[in-house]
């Protein structure tokens, strides 16, 4: 789907410096539309109120299709990130399907509880999907990080909006297409490629119920600010870098 304004940006193979393709450049208008669609899907109950057995079936199908398209997705990840194809095969073809399978298998094994009370009182602890969840994904593990955010939220019955890094949007878009093939209903899983303004719009949106962010410590702090200035949505933060390396002239 094109961005509302029709804008696009190029994604580059960092190993060659050559253009791969043009991708929709989303902005706050697209965020508003995606949140509206996600909320409508959530409120309809088409996914949020579907049976655990149905969600399990769809997520296991999702895992199966990710395995089926593992080689294709690994190549796509490699050319979009510049990573070794061997690394991409391990992450994309092996680990990503495993995560969807794990959460799919978990769905019908998590239950509510009856709290201890006196005989005249009944206390029930019920697990419910929080609503519309935004996942902000970095460039270093684009598909894996997207899956880590998608799978548990979808398993719980939430609607999910993924904002991939502008450097590496391709596999997140492809995974959303595979999700539709697996049976994820329209509006339940959305991907918004674009720049930092898209992440900020998601963080500030009052109809986004939770944010999961992976990225720098500085930008993670912004999301706490966005939450405090909007609807106090819960924000899960995975911040900071590790494993630096030194490149010498020779």
Segment roles from a protein language model:
Residues 13-18, 76, 237:
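Short acidic (Asp/Glu) and glycine-rich catalytic loops that position anionic groups and cofactors
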Residues 20-110:
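Glycine-rich loop-to-alpha-helix module at the N-terminal edge of alpha/beta enzyme cores
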Residues 111-250:
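Rossmann-like NAD(P) dinucleotide-binding subdomain of oxidoreductase/dehydrogenase enzymes
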Residues 16, 25, 166:
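Short, glycine/acidic-enriched loop or turn micro-motifs at the edges of active sites
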Residues 1-16, 22, 41:
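Hydrophobic face of amphipathic alpha-helices that form TPR/SEL1-like repeat modules
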Residues 17, 55, 153-154:
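Hydrophobic alpha-helical segments that mediate membrane insertion or helix-helix packing
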